[in-house]
Amino acid sequence: MKTGILLTLCYDGSNYHGWINQTNSISTQTVLNKAIKKVIKTSEFKTIGASKTDANVHALDQKVLLIIYFTPILEKFINAINKALPEDIRILNAKFVDPNFNIREVDYKIYNYYINDHKFDIFTNRYEYFWKHSKIDILKLQEIFNLFIGEHEFKLFSGLKENEWDNYQTKRIIDDIKVLRINNKVVIQFKATGFIRYQIRIIIANCLNAYLNYKVNINTLTEMLQGIGKKTPFIIKAKGLVLQEIKFK
């Protein structure tokens, strides 16, 4: 009997090479699968993540469809898996779903990027980017990010190589971007149904450089959003990026 279980997962991505199974690196999915296998004593199961987080990216609300071939007592089953997991990965909750549930059919995903422009903090540095310049004017920065809201050509703001452009839908819609100040930290919040590889981090790096008037400006970004020009080498560190929420249709 095929059983579907929807897991809500949180993890500190610092020690992992992203979500997806890797041949030569340790990923979050690899470690989760290892814990599940230890509990059920078989390899006959499947996990599918709703979001393919990159290396060193964290998650507070990753959704994972687990397909197994028996019906467990759910609370005991999840407790056993959590016991087998390392401390930097945790299943927050779980529920039974149709095994054919489409984990990729989301209404929206929210990613937050955290920037510390106040005072260096060794205890939070693992989860934020430390800004070495003067305090960020969030209204000025918001104006730059507003360029990216809506439907645009994002191929120049992606980690895709030029020979990959035809294989991906690079014209995408970003529903909203908010620049917030919360507890002396700047939080840049992205909302969309999905993102291209490295898209958020490349957009942030370019916007911050435009804010500083360093090598790119509003005109440059506007042209790039039309697919005009070439990619810049700018990409911000992954450690400040957190998968904050996934909402299904």
UniProtKB/Swiss-Prot annotation:
Q: What is this protein called?
A: tRNA pseudouridine synthase A
Organism lineage string: Bacteria, Bacillati, Mycoplasmatota, Mollicutes, Mycoplasmataceae
Q: Which HAMAP family match?
A: TruA
What UniProt keywords are attached to this protein's entry?
Answer: Isomerase, tRNA processing
UniProt entry tagged with the keyword tRNA processing = yes
| Catalytic residue positions | 54 (nucleophile)
Q: Name one GO biological process term.
A: tRNA pseudouridine synthesis
Quaternary structure per UniProt? Homodimer.
